[in-house]
Amino acid sequence: MSERVVLAYSGGLDTSVAISWIGKETGAEVVAVAIDLGQGGEDMNVVRQRALDCGAVESIVIDARDEFAEQYCLPTIQANALYMGQYPLVSAISRPLIVKHLVEAAKFHGADTVAHGCTGKGNDQVRFEVGIGALAPDLNVIAPVRDYAWTREKAIAFAEENKLPINVTKKSPFSIDQNVWGRAVETGFLEDLWNAPTKDVYDYTADPTVNFEAPDELIITFDKGVPVAIDGRPVSVLEAIVELNHRAGRQGVGRLDMVEDRLVGIKSREIYEAPGAITLITAHQALEHVTIERELGRYKRQVEQRWGELAYDGLWFSPLKRALDAFVQDTQQHVSGDIRMVLHGGSAVVNGRRSEQSLYDFNLATYDEGDTFDQSLAKGFVQIHGLSSKVAARRDLNQK
């Protein structure tokens, strides 16, 4: 059997050209692996056939939607992970899943080389290659777009010269990546930071300033940090994301326009749509505020930031990430209950919380009759709490 290369295949121009190019340049057979992450668009059977038509000896489509939701999106919810306080890691958390299946396919087909279509300016090259190195350190990696400085024009010329069945007549001005967790848009006129996004940038969300529908009130139920029901109806994690993408997206929830610090050292403007992700993370945070003790909550917020950075930086399979996963999972033991939210005008606003695991004690919190808080203890507490500051202040005043 000839040497084989396993390619992470998207169905787009670059990876379609890569199939033929790898065969011609290396003499290897190409096995194309396409992952269904709920990205929509083309039928995956069409994508599979295109890979074969471009010269792949085998073309595999893997339905990983539930796996993505349960093993990648759910940990992101439980970690309340928002890179730079905003971005719910739409693309970042999909890459380790693709890497996992790429490595498994390489082992199954006896390949010692894998390939991807990432450029040299983005984060994904790091996510792919660091992830591959963590799971299969002996695998070789080919990155033709990066290593041979492919441009769109070069790729089109190669496709035409080799009569590859790729339709390249219509060119979007944007680079788009999407899955069930959200949608990322960049490049084109968006590279000028002063240019406002036009309506054609968006697809997952309605314009909240124009499409002012009636508010949508809903209740999300969590069990140990897992969303298990919407409005009392049981749902899987995937079903929760899909339903909230529709309901929150219709209200314009989840639009982000940010300048992002890329791992490779440059700043990049990104437009994100993540209605389901933002709604679920907002609800989960609200329930944690009710059910997690103060010091644990404070420390978890530090962990959340680092967790998001590790996921963004391609270190999903790192020892530190695994350790933080264990910490986050332990914090979820009491994160059970209901969160009521109103979706409207681009916002997901929490307006109700209830939980049998709640640490909120009405009788301690109330200022009305029935107050059980012993205020006689407060004076001594205040004095002890501020004692070190008072001692330091006396020293400083005496030295003036």
Curated annotation (Swiss-Prot):
One GO cellular component, as annotated: cytoplasm
GO molecular function: argininosuccinate synthase activity; ATP binding
Class of enzymatic activity (EC top level): ligase
Pathway given in the UniProt record: Amino-acid biosynthesis; L-arginine biosynthesis; L-arginine from L-ornithine and carbamoyl phosphate: step 2/3
Catalytic activity: L-citrulline + L-aspartate + ATP = 2-(N(omega)-L-arginino)succinate + AMP + diphosphate + H(+)
Keywords: Amino-acid biosynthesis, Arginine biosynthesis, ATP-binding, Cytoplasm, Ligase, Nucleotide-binding
Subcellular locations according to the entry: Cytoplasm
PANTHER family: ARGININOSUCCINATE SYNTHASE
The protein's name: Argininosuccinate synthase
Source organism of the structure: Nocardia farcinica (strain IFM 10152)
Lineage, opening ranks: Bacteria, Bacillati, Actinomycetota, Actinomycetes, Mycobacteriales
